[in-house]
From Swiss-Prot:
Residues covered by region (Disordered): 1-44
Ribonucleoprotein as UniProt keyword: yes
Pfam families: Ribosomal_L34
Database matches in PANTHER family: LARGE RIBOSOMAL SUBUNIT PROTEIN BL34M, MITOCHONDRIAL RIBOSOMAL PROTEIN 34 FAMILY MEMBER
Organism, scientific name: Gluconobacter oxydans (strain 621H)
Name this protein carries in UniProt: Large ribosomal subunit protein bL34
Length: 44
């Protein structure tokens, strides 16, 4: 059986990266929430 998690740095960056998050309203909301929580890492 094939495993569901097949790591790829490029796909990770494209889907969950900072630039991608910044593009959409929802993504910006995610960043804002993580900033207010004081997360060291905002995105992948």
């Amino acid at each position: 059986m094939k495993r569901t998690y097949q790591p790829s740095k490029l796909v990770r960056k494209r889907r969950h990266g900072f630039r991608t998050r910044s593009e959409t309203v929802g993504g910006r909301r995610v960043l804002a929430n993580r900033r207010s929580k004081g997360r060291k890492k905002l995105s992948a």
